[in-house]
Amino acid sequence: MHDLRALRADPAAFDAALARRGEAPAAIHIASLDEDRRAAVTALQDKQARRKSLSKEVGALRRTGEDSTALEAEAVQLREDIEKLEVLVRELDAEIRDCLVVLPNRLDDGVPEGADESANVVVHQVGERRDFAFPPREHFALGEALGLMDFETAGKLSGARFVVLRGALARMERALGQFMLDLHVQEHGYTETAVPVLVNEAAMFGTDKLPKFADQSFRTEDGRWLIPTAEVPLTASVAGDILPASALPRRMVALSSCFRSEAGAAGRDTRGMLRQHQFQKVEMVSITAPGDSDAEHERMTRCAEKVLERLGIPYRRMLLCAGDTGFGAARTFDLEAWLPGQDAWREISSCSTTRDFQARRMNARYRPADGAGPEFVHTLNGSGLAVGRTLIAVMENYQNADGSITVPQALRPYMNGLAAISAR
């Protein structure tokens, strides 16, 4: 949600920020609605004040036995006027809100211009890509040959974009999630949190998933939503709160199932585990004071990078351009892992700062240490990492000519010392 005061102060700058994302100008229309609302509020307050004084005047006349008919008639008219003005204020409030909630966050000045992912900027690249002595295979070919990755049974059970993992691959997926959680909790200072996968509409709205992405999420018949990411319950846990400055930064991490309808993804990544309706993901969320959020964004991204470094997966950090930055983000770093089977870099983590965009939607604030009035917090979120995609990266980077997969050293303590996954 945007700050109306900032819009009123500089409507041209507001529209320029929208233009960076390819959005049409909106400031003049919203400012006009806001002027109408403020005028209606002033008129309402004047009428309410007059009603209060009128009540005293009528009472005084009645006590002296004088005629109060004219004043009583005025009171009737005032009541009608107040009711109409109250309706008008509510309608204008709703109209302004409807305009604001569909507008994306204002981008950081350092976000590069560009319409799509082709304009994203490589910040750095880490790790050497392995030189294979054989043609590397994609993860689904490896998994099916091992007899441990079953898309046919998943299709029978649930349809397309699901998978059944068995044996050592299922164990490796579990090991990856546990390894990531342990790293973030024990070394990075996050608090492990177990969250519901069903949330209410307010939680989805507050984390900017509604109304914009309603068609990309699953809604239950009773009006609740399956979470597309644990960012939703973690971030929404501070909705409506006023946190003490001493409680910041608040760092939380969760491993959860995530659910996405993948609307608009027809024909993309139809084979394998890259794009699924249900998947596991470790999510990091930080709640900070405004002055600390940029440093926290870098810190969070480094926490995600550490996972890839411990696993020995080559990766690169990308700064997303204006046209590729998500709706609620002010700035986003994507981490892309090298997948030799695809001969391509693929996103495995996305770390974003939303500044106060989500906080305004959910009224999440903190009280500064100097005793000043409450201010909106800043919220950040990042994948630490997507477990299924990390499994893909491990399989493709650690595959052997005979189709077996070497288990990375970092995962062996979680797999009872298993050194390699071979065909059953």
Curated annotation (Swiss-Prot):
Record localization: Cytoplasm
Coiled-coil region list: none
InterPro entries in alphabetical order: aa-tRNA-synt_IIb, aa-tRNA-synth_II, aa-tRNA-synth_II/BPL/LPL, Ser-tRNA-ligase_type_1, Ser-tRNA-synth_1_N, SerRS_1_N_sf, SerRS_core, tRNA-bd_arm
Entry binding sites for L-serine: T229, A230, E231, E283, S383
Keywords: Aminoacyl-tRNA synthetase, ATP-binding, Cytoplasm, Ligase, Nucleotide-binding, Protein biosynthesis
Gene3D superfamilies with a match to the protein in the record: Bira Bifunctional Protein, Domain 2, Serine-tRNA synthetase, tRNA binding domain
Reaction catalyzed: tRNA(Ser) + L-serine + ATP = L-seryl-tRNA(Ser) + AMP + diphosphate + H(+); tRNA(Sec) + L-serine + ATP = L-seryl-tRNA(Sec) + AMP + diphosphate + H(+)
Assembly: Homodimer. The tRNA molecule binds across the dimer.
PANTHER family documented for this protein: SERINE--TRNA LIGASE, SERYL-TRNA SYNTHETASE
Protein name according to UniProt: Serine--tRNA ligase
Species this protein is from: Gluconacetobacter diazotrophicus (strain ATCC 49037 / DSM 5601 / CCUG 37298 / CIP 103539 / LMG 7603 / PAl5)
